[in-house]
């Protein structure tokens, strides 16, 4: 089991990296936190972000996914959304340590 300090460090790294990739690609969305779920033998990290410019999606997701895979097996799901005239791709991810 990992310590609380390690969990906090991982959460901060993920938020910082995701936000820097989004900012670099001129995306307006910023991730504010990563959630954790404590299981008996592991910790599950879960988060999501949005990409508004669909032309940026491949570059953004490739860079973020590469970073997330450094933590091991990552489950990544994306869905194109059209909400009140706004179009974006919602991406969720989770992994266990």
Say what each PLM segment does.
Residues 58-76:
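Short, non-transmembrane amphipathic alpha-helical segments
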Residues 79-97:
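C-terminal edge-of-domain segments
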């Amino acid at each position: 089991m990992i310590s609380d300090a390690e969990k906090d460090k991982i959460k901060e790294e993920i938020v910082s990296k995701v936000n820097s990739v989004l900012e670099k690609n001129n995306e307006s969305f910023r991730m504010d936190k990563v959630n954790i779920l404590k299981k008996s033998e592991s910790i599950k990290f879960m988060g999501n972000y949005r990409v508004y410019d669909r032309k940026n999606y491949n570059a953004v997701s490739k860079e973020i996914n590469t970073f997330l895979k450094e933590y091991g097996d990552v489950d990544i799901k994306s869905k194109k959304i059209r909400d009140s005239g706004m179009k974006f791709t919602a991406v969720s991810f989770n992994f266990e340590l």
